[in-house]
Amino acid sequence: MKEQNILDIQTRNEFRTWLETHHTTEKACWVCVKRGRPTDDDTFWYIDAVEEALCFGWIDSRQKPIDGVLMQCFTPRKRNSPWSELNKERARRLEKLGRMTDAGRRVLPPMGARSFRIDEDVEAALKAARAWTKFKTFPLLYQRIRAYNVAFYKKRDAQMYQQALAHLIEETKKGKMFGDWNDYGRLLDY
């Protein structure tokens, strides 16, 4: 099957311009983005692409090589699709920065900080392992993102859930936060 809308986009602004024109009429697009810690060069970064997609009610989905180049697919977000805590925080930041559009706002879930509750099984496991007190000393954003990410697997993949939970407990007991939970600092002070 030939993929549609393989875009030759080099910058965040070019992607935003494409989304402004096509977000209501197209079903998908593919772009080449670089992963990793963004720098101030002219590289089109994955995080930038995700942020622009969120502004228009779109979301990243699968990656695959097309003509020998690894491409990222973006699609309109499906109604009632789950929102990760990371994407919720990105949306809060984009709203505050004035980048969010009405199309993006229409698909937002409840956004209050109190709309998130740590999964009771994740909380119980942290408490049983004597890691809960340490976990509660970490930033609230970290707590929400890590607890959500572990709970995400609970109904989808029991083995992955157990591995993610064990890793969270192990790192928490060491007093270590892990992973890119704040988009390389973008989500800390905005």
Tell where the protein language model's regions lie, with residue ranges.
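Charge-dense, helix-prone N-terminal extensions
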Residues: M1-Y190
